[in-house]
Amino acid sequence: MMPRNWKSVLSIAITSLLTSAGMPRLAVAQTRVSIGVTETMETYNPYGDSVALLYDLYSEVTGPFCSYNFATGEYEGRLAQRWEIKDPNTWVFYLDKRYTFNDGSPVTSADVVHSMSRVLAPDSKHTTLASPMLKAEAVDKYTVKLITKNPTAPLLDFICDRFIITSKAAYEKYGAADADRYHMLGGGPYARKEMVPGQRIVLVKRPDHHEAKKNPQAPDEIVFRPMREPEQRVTALLNNEIQIAQFIPPHLRKRVEASPHHKVVAADSLELMFLAMQPKPPFDKKEVRQAVCYAIDRDKIIATLLEGFATRLDGPIGPGQYGYDPNLQPRYGYNPQKAKQLLSQAGYPNGVDVELQTPVGRYTLDKQITEAMVPMLNAVGIRTRLATPEWPTLWANVQAGKVPFYYMGRGQVLDPSPPLHQYFRTGVTPRIGYSNPKVDEILFKEQEEFDPAKRKKYLAQAMSLITEEAPACFMWRHKLLWGISDKVDYQPPPDAGIFGLHIKVRR
């Protein structure tokens, strides 16, 4: 168990470890916060994965291009101080000259152009950001144009908290692999000190950074520790091995609440949980996909397993998200008889065998939830075998379009346009592989429409058609529970992001 004087015990010298990466000499770290997280990154390449933790981490290390402020409900400048729309396909961004890489060199438009080229590269996993983009062009040292293939009204939702800016000079000097692994230069308030894929990621604060000065109580060092099992995260929290535990399942919250030195903090989530179905037999039949949606008793799962800590979804998005329509049709109430009829209409009167793949420990009670779904599906004739591959394997196969039926979430959904294009527009990603020319047409129209009222109408049309076609069954948004030590103050945002500058270490 960690001693109570944990801050002094955890004081560490970091100077020598950073110098090899071309970083400035920093002071001895006085405070460290360890965080138990549910996922990790399997590559040093910041453009080589697209998990939520990657965007959180590199927002700290490279500084986000721009960011969404949940308190004001507006996008605000960061690396890009301000912007303007020159024409429907051209956005001009003016960089904040205060930002420098951790070797002291300025962050310039050349770095933005370089970074966009990496986003658009064939090996990039940032396909959602890449989908509307044509190119970036430098206007002058601190001014850059982002040019889209077509008018893209929600462009800020594609790039803010998503567009990672890395050093062109480091890339050219060391090459991509060594620059990413050994010379990760960023303009953010933290520097990447250590990364062991699958084990830990360590960030250290840049105390002279103008953003770091806004929160003097932000931890000097942050350690992200992947812990798949919720019991592991809770135990580590109560043993003071970590100070923040991500995603405590409802049935374990009382263990945390019973501790005089810990608490549970709830945060509404913007993550959409769904069952995805590739259009391959038997899911090439719309009736089979709809049968799956009717077979799942979402209200029962929310009331029992989730103990009410979730909001049911009757379409791709829910209350509070841009373009939400409470009257969206159709709706899939629990109706096993209807599911059986649809299965028979699809040509499977005697049922059909399928495999459902789920992560374990990535989302709240993911394995237990899918275990509860299996008998519901079996009851209507969809004979289901549950598979639980390791997360790196499952995630790689989902991104490659190799998983016909799976349970997963899509996080950080403020505006539904990016995820709708990502999962349901032809050719953007193979994660579901769904293709419908009518859906494509509507999605292009909504993306090109700068009038908010008209755009919301297009979004409603697209979401209604997608719900009817059912390439995915939309389940719920979790109300996420976090375990917090009394050594820190932290209120997780609705996008479940983990940002060091939002954490205050109690002195």
What role is predicted for each listed range?
Residues 25, 84, 128-172, 194:
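Surface-exposed binding/hinge segments that line
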Residues 482-507:
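Long beta-strand-rich cores associated with HINT superfamily self-processing modules
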Residues 208-255, 375, 383:
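Ligand-site clamp/hinge motif
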Residues 36-87, 94, 117, 185:
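N-terminal lobe/hinge region of extracytoplasmic solute-binding protein
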Residues 197, 344-412, 452, 480:
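Ligand/substrate-recognition segments at binding pockets and active sites
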Residues 312-345, 363-367:
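Structural transition elements
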Residues 379-394, 421-486, 507:
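Extracytoplasmic/peripheral linker and loop segments enriched in polar/acidic and small residues
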Residues 69-74, 161-217, 221-223, 229-231, ...:
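Gly/Pro-rich hinge or "lid" segments in bacterial periplasmic/extracellular proteins
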